């Protein structure tokens, strides 16, 4: 099974990275930038291809990927034409605008390699079988979407559905169809079609790749764009991204909001795109006069296009990710871009310092006001009303909620002291450095949203956190993601200060020793040059290799952060917060006797599969059987709860099937649908909220009901053959 998991990981990585990378490179974007933004662009290309081929009547993976390839060819063609029209020098200045020396591919690969290994250990520890699934109503819906795409070849997010096009019309109980952000579902469905693996496994692989690769690489790239381009920061990133319980562990444990998880994981990469785009809009003071003149009038159109596609990709993953992205980039605009723009305009038009300050103040107020205006407008639009008016009834007093932010216990109220210490060191460091200052504002904004999401004042709750369903789990995840870069800076700053102090002490001792002795040929060879290259003694070799030693310390610190034991309680072995997160993740994925879809039910279903083959099986979705199509390919009738637009035969079957022996109307419905069997599992733990005995009164069948024959039974589980219509 784990070999199949590895195969699926490779396929999903190819789907997430190759199309986007080729498209970005076709536009002339640098290799490393193309690699970072590839998942966003790939999702956008797959999404638009799915929409484009639908009205053409094209179905399946081949037309979908063919459309993606066509978009790449169009991009390459346009880039070639532009290159021919413009002078070579102008093209070169546009190509490099905002990208020069911004990202280091080696450090990104280091982060990706270590983070993948770390999260695989976490994943394997919690989810011991990659075909286990999170047992929740939302996840059953996600799996139904994926299965429908696999069976129908339809990938349009404008026509998302549980059944339509997947089966014959008379075997399609519900016809509801509409918009749904299906990026995760499309990637999983394509991976299922290519590999032949089940939808449950490929769904797990998509969110695994998002968390293990896309998220850490995005954070590492973000740190590089603001100047933290070194091995220590890259190594720390691999550990710190998993050190906060609120994200990713809690987000993949509760609600089954996997599309939201995928979107949040891609936000750092989208922020990187935005920063690179704006970096080209205003020249750096450190650039030469010629470079400033070249870039003063232009914004890299390639990065603008990619940024727009990145924003659309976030919406295709989950629209709430776009609002989180906006929360992250607004502080960058206010704290970094606008001051640089003001300085540039001040120099260009020789404005006085007073006028420059006034200009900055006006631009800051206008930008902030515009942002608030857009926020209020969207908050009151009709298409977002179901989201922003949804209320999670979880309430915590503001001071108590703020305290959980300070100690990073967040919603679970389990303080993570080591993470908190690193963060607050980083917070001070960011305040003192103007290049990092915006990170603190982004964190504070997410913290306010989180505290507001726990408020018992509904207008406040709705205004601040409505775009995230007022869900404190999601807002806590945003706090964690916003805190990660700051915590990494705090750790890197601490390690650097310690090693700088050691380096200073060694140099001081050596210098004093050399002054008090005659210099021999051996001692003279031990002098310390500015870069340490001439050092040969042990202390000086320490200085020479302090970068490697710092990385080793970073690994040790990262291991401490992710320790399964609460270090404060040693020698007693108490679980750490991360260990609890792994335990909780296991509890919602592993089928047990207390879960909706039990281990014993799974054994019964495997036996039933040998009997039913491809025949249509009527089932009660409230007993957990609605996932069997995705898990084993069983041709079940109901893989979703009751929807609005329903097949007339479905209404008859779910309300009157137990009358099949004597009711001609029911017999006709059974014949028309082709139903042959009825599968009944345990209803003690209903999969979906609701009165199953009301909606599925026709499936209240016992061994004494005429018209059915028991073909398999174990305890309360039954597989009946419908004999009344034979």
Predicted features along the sequence, with ranges:
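Perimembrane helix-loop-helix junctions
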Residues: 288-293, 325-366
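Membrane-helix boundary/interfacial segments in multi-pass membrane proteins
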Residues: 7, 56-64, 129-139, 196, ...
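Membrane-embedded, hydrophobic transmembrane alpha-helices
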Residues: 1-101, 526
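Membrane-interface helix-loop junctions at the exits of transmembrane helices
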Residues: 45-49, 117-127, 152, 234-253, ...
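Membrane-interface alpha helices of multi-pass inner-membrane proteins
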Residues: 291-319
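Extracytoplasmic
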Residues: 11, 17, 512-515, 555-726
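Hydrophobic, aromatic-rich transmembrane alpha-helices
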Residues: 340-343, 417-440
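Active-site lumenal/periplasmic loops and adjacent helix-entry segments of GT-C-fold
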Residues: 116-265, 285, 294, 582-597
């Amino acid at each position: 099974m784990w070999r199949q998991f590895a195969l699926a990981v490779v396929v999903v990585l190819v789907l997430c990275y190759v199309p986007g990378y080729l498209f970005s490179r076709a536009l002339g974007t640098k290799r490393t930038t193309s690699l970072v933004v590839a998942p966003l662009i790939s999702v956008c290309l797959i999404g638009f291809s799915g929409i484009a081929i639908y009205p053409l009547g094209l179905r399946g993976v081949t037309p979908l990927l063919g459309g993606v390839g066509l978009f790449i060819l169009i991009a390459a063609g346009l880039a070639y034409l532009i290159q021919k029209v413009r002078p070579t020098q102008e093209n070169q200045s546009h190509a490099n605008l905002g990208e020069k020396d911004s990202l280091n591919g080696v450090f990104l690969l280091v982060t990706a390699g270590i983070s993948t290994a770390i999260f695989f250990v976490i994943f394997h520890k919690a989810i011991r079988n990659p075909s286990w699934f999170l047992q929740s109503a939302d996840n059953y819906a996600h799996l139904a979407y994926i299965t429908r795409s696999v069976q129908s070849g339809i990938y349009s997010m404008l026509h998302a559905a549980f059944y339509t096009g997947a089966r014959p019309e008379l075997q399609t109980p519900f016809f509801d169809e509409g918009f749904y952000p299906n990026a995760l579902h499309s990637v999983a469905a394509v991976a299922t079609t290519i590999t032949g693996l089940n939808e449950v496994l490929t769904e797990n692989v998509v969110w695994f790749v998002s968390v293990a690769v896309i998220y850490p690489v995005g954070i590492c790239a973000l740190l590089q764009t603001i100047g933290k381009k070194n091995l220590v920061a890259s190594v720390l990133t691999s550990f710190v991204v998993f050190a906060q319980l609120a994200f990713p562990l809690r987000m993949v444990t509760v609600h089954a909001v996997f599309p939201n998880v995928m979107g949040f994981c891609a936000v750092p990469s989208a922020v990187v795109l935005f920063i690179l785009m704006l970096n080209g809009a205003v020249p750096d003071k450190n650039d030469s006069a010629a470079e400033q003149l070249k870039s003063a009038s232009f914004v890299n159109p390639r990065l603008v296009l990619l940024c727009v596609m990145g924003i659309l990709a976030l919406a295709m993953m989950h629209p709430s990710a776009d609002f989180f992205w906006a929360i992250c980039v607004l502080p960058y605009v206010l704290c970094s871009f606008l001051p640089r723009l003001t300085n540039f305009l001040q120099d260009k038009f020789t404005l006085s310092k007073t006028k420059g300050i006034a200009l900055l103040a006006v631009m800051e107020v206008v930008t902030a006001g515009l942002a608030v205006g857009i926020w209020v407008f969207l908050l009151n639009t009709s298409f977002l009303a179901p989201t922003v008016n949804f209320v999670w009834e979880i309430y915590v007093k503001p001071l108590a909620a703020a305290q959980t932010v300070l100690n990073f216990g967040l919603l679970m109220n389990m303080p993570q002291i080591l993470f908190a210490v690193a963060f607050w060191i980083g917070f001070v460091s960011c305040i003192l450095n103007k290049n990092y200052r915006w990170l603190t504002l982004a964190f504070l904004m997410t913290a306010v949203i989180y505290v507001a999401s726990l408020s018992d004042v509904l207008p406040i709750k709705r205004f601040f956190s409505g775009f995230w369903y007022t869900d404190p789990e999601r807002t806590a995840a945003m706090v964690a993601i916003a805190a990660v870069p700051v915590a990494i800076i705090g750790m890197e700053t601490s390690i650097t200060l310690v090693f700088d102090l050691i380096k200073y002490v060694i140099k001081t001792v050596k210098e004093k020793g050399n002054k008090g002795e005659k210099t021999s040929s051996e001692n003279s060879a031990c002098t310390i040059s500015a870069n340490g290259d001439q050092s040969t003694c042990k202390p000086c070799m320490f200085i020479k290799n302090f970068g490697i030693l710092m990385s080793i310390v970073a690994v040790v610190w990262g291991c401490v952060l992710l320790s399964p034991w609460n270090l404060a309680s040693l020698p007693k072995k108490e679980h750490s917060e991360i260990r609890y997160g792994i335990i909780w993740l296991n509890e919602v994925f592993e089928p047990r006797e207390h879960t909706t879809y039990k281990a014993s039910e799974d054994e019964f279903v495997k036996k039933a599969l040998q009997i039913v083959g491809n025949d249509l099986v009527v089932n009660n979705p409230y007993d957990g059987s609605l996932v069997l199509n995705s898990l084993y390919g069983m041709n079940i009738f109901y893989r979703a709860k009751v929807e609005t637009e329903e097949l007339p035969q479905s209404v008859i079957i779910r309300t009157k099937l137990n009358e099949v022996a004597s009711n001609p109307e029911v017999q006709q419905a059974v014949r028309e649908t082709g139903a042959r069997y009825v599968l009944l599992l345990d209803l003690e733990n209903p999969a979906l909220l609701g009165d199953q005995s009301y909606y599925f009164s026709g499936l209240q069948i016992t061994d004494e009901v005429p018209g059915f024959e028991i073909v398999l039974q174990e305890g309360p589980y039954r597989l009946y053959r419908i004999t009344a219509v034979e």
